[in-house]
């Protein structure tokens, strides 16, 4: 796998292409991964997980892959800059223009690195809000074979989430970019709310595209209006062409 580098950052997105990015945040056991899978299926987003990208990169026998593997084995954090560059590289190579970034930004350092490197404003941050009690119950009940699914480790993960990720959530809330859903319910009930949020995003993009497509006849200067009327008189409007 090629390294994420400056050239990747500079060449994406292509000129004139609109990229849609949504962050998805939730505590351990909140069900955000399940909701991401449903969003991908319903709305055609590409699902990106910082953790998955790091684990994938660590498989390669390269200087960067070895460094990531060693840091992860030692329980140390990988630099935010590297995480962001891996995310951006994955976006560039995906061929899609809509991305769900799962579990990111995890902290304020992640957020700053994203803003400094990528320069694409997220549409919003989707927060799957779930109580500690419900998340704990789900993690203990699931059978994923994870070594860290014991009560003490689970509670430490909750504490880390509270301390590091809540400031990120508050940041986007102040900017009017927080979309929060109640994650304590059944999967399909949660997705009804999630679906409504993404349907609204789709509608905004459709209307935005129509507004950006050109001036109305009344907004044109007289010369442009004359050409517009001449064209429509010769070839008919779109509505006439359909009839």
Swiss-Prot record:
<dbReference type="GO" id="GO:0006207">
    <property type="term" value="P:'de novo' pyrimidine nucleobase biosynthetic process"/>
</dbReference>
<dbReference type="GO" id="GO:0004127">
    <property type="term" value="F:(d)CMP kinase activity"/>
</dbReference>
<dbReference type="GO" id="GO:0036430">
    <property type="term" value="F:CMP kinase activity"/>
</dbReference>
<feature type="region of interest" description="LID">
    <location>
        <begin position="141"/>
        <end position="149"/>
    </location>
</feature>
<keyword id="KW-0418">Kinase</keyword>
<feature type="binding site">
    <location>
        <position position="185"/>
    </location>
    <ligand>
        <name>ATP</name>
    </ligand>
</feature>
<dbReference type="GO" id="GO:0005524">
    <property type="term" value="F:ATP binding"/>
</dbReference>
<feature type="binding site">
    <location>
        <begin position="76"/>
        <end position="78"/>
    </location>
    <ligand>
        <name>a ribonucleoside 5'-phosphate</name>
    </ligand>
</feature>
<comment type="function">
    <text>Catalyzes the phosphorylation of pyrimidine nucleoside monophosphates at the expense of ATP. Plays an important role in de novo pyrimidine nucleotide biosynthesis. Has preference for UMP and CMP as phosphate acceptors.</text>
</comment>
<dbReference type="InterPro" id="IPR006266">
    <property type="entry name" value="UMP_CMP_kinase"/>
</dbReference>
<feature type="binding site">
    <location>
        <position position="146"/>
    </location>
    <ligand>
        <name>a ribonucleoside 5'-phosphate</name>
    </ligand>
</feature>
<feature type="region of interest" description="NMP">
    <location>
        <begin position="49"/>
        <end position="78"/>
    </location>
</feature>
<feature type="binding site">
    <location>
        <position position="157"/>
    </location>
    <ligand>
        <name>a ribonucleoside 5'-phosphate</name>
    </ligand>
</feature>
<comment type="subunit">
    <text>Monomer.</text>
</comment>
<dbReference type="GO" id="GO:0036431">
    <property type="term" value="F:dCMP kinase activity"/>
</dbReference>
<dbReference type="InterPro" id="IPR033690">
    <property type="entry name" value="Adenylat_kinase_CS"/>
</dbReference>
<feature type="binding site">
    <location>
        <position position="55"/>
    </location>
    <ligand>
        <name>a ribonucleoside 5'-phosphate</name>
    </ligand>
</feature>
<dbReference type="GO" id="GO:0033862">
    <property type="term" value="F:UMP kinase activity"/>
</dbReference>
<dbReference type="InterPro" id="IPR000850">
    <property type="entry name" value="Adenylat/UMP-CMP_kin"/>
</dbReference>
<feature type="binding site">
    <location>
        <begin position="29"/>
        <end position="34"/>
    </location>
    <ligand>
        <name>ATP</name>
    </ligand>
</feature>
<keyword id="KW-0067">ATP-binding</keyword>
<protein>
    <recommendedName>
        <fullName>UMP-CMP kinase 1</fullName>
        <ecNumber>2.7.4.14</ecNumber>
    </recommendedName>
</protein>
<feature type="binding site">
    <location>
        <position position="110"/>
    </location>
    <ligand>
        <name>CMP</name>
    </ligand>
</feature>
<keyword id="KW-0547">Nucleotide-binding</keyword>
<keyword id="KW-0539">Nucleus</keyword>
<dbReference type="InterPro" id="IPR027417">
    <property type="entry name" value="P-loop_NTPase"/>
</dbReference>
<dbReference type="Pfam" id="PF00406">
    <property type="entry name" value="ADK"/>
</dbReference>
<dbReference type="GO" id="GO:0006225">
    <property type="term" value="P:UDP biosynthetic process"/>
</dbReference>
<feature type="binding site">
    <location>
        <begin position="103"/>
        <end position="106"/>
    </location>
    <ligand>
        <name>a ribonucleoside 5'-phosphate</name>
    </ligand>
</feature>
<dbReference type="GO" id="GO:0046705">
    <property type="term" value="P:CDP biosynthetic process"/>
</dbReference>
<comment type="similarity">
    <text>Belongs to the adenylate kinase family. UMP-CMP kinase subfamily.</text>
</comment>
<keyword id="KW-0963">Cytoplasm</keyword>
<dbReference type="GO" id="GO:0005737">
    <property type="term" value="C:cytoplasm"/>
</dbReference>
<keyword id="KW-0665">Pyrimidine biosynthesis</keyword>
<dbReference type="GO" id="GO:0005634">
    <property type="term" value="C:nucleus"/>
</dbReference>
<keyword id="KW-0808">Transferase</keyword>
<feature type="binding site">
    <location>
        <position position="142"/>
    </location>
    <ligand>
        <name>ATP</name>
    </ligand>
</feature>
